[in-house]
Design a protein with these regions (language model features):
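N-terminal intrinsically disordered, low-complexity segments enriched in P/E/S/T
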Residues: 28-177
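Bacterial N-terminal signal peptides
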Residues: 8-22
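N-terminal secretory signal peptides that target proteins for export/translocation
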Residues: 1-5
Length: 177
C-alpha cells in the first residue's frame, strides 16, 4: 500500500517538474519549413545551402502522381533536382560523358535514410523522367512527417526513393579502377 502511494507521489512530482503533457500538437511544420535547410555538396563546383524561401524563388515544377503507398493521386510542387544540381555546378547535358557518367547522387533524410541515383538518371538530356524536391503537396506545405522537403521520383514503380524529410544531397564521383 505504501509502495503505491510513493509511486503516485513520484508521478505527481515528475508532472510538476516537467509539466503536463499537452494533447495539442505544437506548430512544428510551420517553423520547421521556415528554418529548414537543404544542403547540396560533394563533387560540385558551388556547394549550396538552400532554404524553403530559396526554393520558392526558383523555377517550379508540378507533378500529379499516384502514390503507391497511399493508393491515391497527389499533386506535388517543387524544383527539379536537375535544376538544383545545375545550380551547384554539376555536369549535365553535353558534359555528361566520361567521368561524369560514373557520378552518383546520395539523397539523405533527417533520420539517416539514404538512396542513390546515378547522375545520368537525373539528366533530362538522357532520360525523360523528372525527379523533384517537393515542398508542397496538394497545394499545402508538406506535413512535418513528410517535409519540409521531399524527393519525389514518380516514374518508379515503388516509392522507395521518395525521400521524406530530405536534408542533404551529396554528389559523389565513383572511383573506377
Amino acid at each position: 500500500m505504501l509502495h503505491r502511494h510513493i509511486r503516485a507521489f513520484v508521478i505527481l512530482l515528475s508532472t510538476l517538474a516537467v509539466g503536463p503533457l499537452s494533447l495539442v500538437p505544437e506548430p512544428r511544420a510551420q517553423t520547421a519549413a521556415s528554418s529548414a535547410e537543404l544542403r547540396i555538396s560533394g563533387a560540385v563546383t558551388t556547394p549550396l545551402v538552400l532554404t524553403a524561401s530559396d526554393l520558392k524563388k526558383m523555377p517550379r515544377k508540378t507533378l500529379s502522381v499516384v502514390n503507391p503507398h497511399e493508393k491515391k493521386t497527389e499533386v506535388y510542387e517543387g524544383v527539379l533536382l536537375e535544376e538544383l544540381l545545375r545550380k551547384a555546378g554539376v555536369p549535365q547535358g553535353e558534359k555528361m560523358r566520361g567521368p561524369a557518367m560514373t557520378t552518383y547522387v546520395v539523397a539523405e533524410a533527417e533520420d539517416g535514410y539514404r538512396v542513390v541515383f546515378s547522375l545520368a538518371e537525373l539528366d533530362l538530356g538522357i532520360v525523360d523522367s523528372e525527379v523533384i524536391v517537393a515542398d508542397t503537396m496538394d497545394g499545402a506545405p508538406l506535413a512535418a512527417k513528410q517535409g519540409p522537403f521531399r524527393l519525389v521520383a514518380p516514374h518508379e514503380k515503388r516509392p522507395a526513393r521518395w525521400v521524406r524529410m530530405l536534408k542533404s544531397i551529396t554528389v559523389v564521383r565513383a572511383s573506377v579502377q
